[in-house]
Amino acid sequence: MTATAQQLEFLKNSIKSIQDYPKPGILFRDVTSLLEDPKAYTLSIELLVERYKKAGITKVVGTEARGFLFGAPVALGLGVGFVPVRKPRKLPRETIAETYELEYGTDQLEIHVDAIKPGDNVLVVDDLLATGGTIEATVKLIRRLGGKVTDAAFIINLFDLGGEQRLEKQGITCYSLVPFPGH
């Protein structure tokens, strides 16, 4: 099932836009409204599974927190394991960490050291691509463990914030279901 224009428009219309959230001047794209609609949520998962079902994916990685909501069902649809990437001190076993830049400071992500095996073909899934910093850090973690990452999938791409270009420089092909301007 290739995504039709009608299906993609349905998904786009299921995402509410909230003006001046979380601060004045921001138009927030609320993917939780898509999650509230079982038809939209199911369709988004089905379209991602269809795109990657013949790609030889061996693991799906999702980044905290909304990446879990899309990554885990995609992993199930592909018949592979799901690996969460989380904020510091949220994973119980031994982890490695990657620090990345935020607009005002830095943050860190962690992954279990035994979650990715050398040679795993990994798909990264998240709800939204903006500047790409979080996904770039996630990709670095996977590669440090020997995993191969060439693709990342998103529900929303805020296309004018530069995330796709940033990830392409890291050898990552980005796919998103719904493009929106970021400003």
UniProtKB/Swiss-Prot annotation:
One of its GO terms (cellular component) is cytosol. Pathway: Purine metabolism; AMP biosynthesis via salvage pathway; AMP from adenine: step 1/1. It catalyses: AMP + diphosphate = 5-phospho-alpha-D-ribose 1-diphosphate + adenine. HAMAP family: Aden_phosphoribosyltr. Its main location: cytoplasm. Keywords: Cytoplasm, Glycosyltransferase, Purine salvage, Transferase. Homodimer. Catalyzes a salvage reaction resulting in the formation of AMP, that is energically less costly than de novo synthesis. GO terms for biological process: adenine salvage; AMP salvage; purine ribonucleoside salvage. Belongs to the purine/pyrimidine phosphoribosyltransferase family. Coiled coil: none annotated. It is found in: Cytoplasm. It comes from Salmonella arizonae (strain ATCC BAA-731 / CDC346-86 / RSK2980). It comes from the Bacteria. The keyword Transmembrane does not apply. The keyword NAD does not apply. GO terms for molecular function: adenine phosphoribosyltransferase activity. This is Adenine phosphoribosyltransferase. Its EC number is 2.4.2.7. Pfam families: Pribosyltran. The gene is apt. InterPro entries: Ade_phspho_trans (IPR005764), Adenine_PRTase (IPR050120), PRibTrfase_dom (IPR000836), PRTase-like (IPR029057).
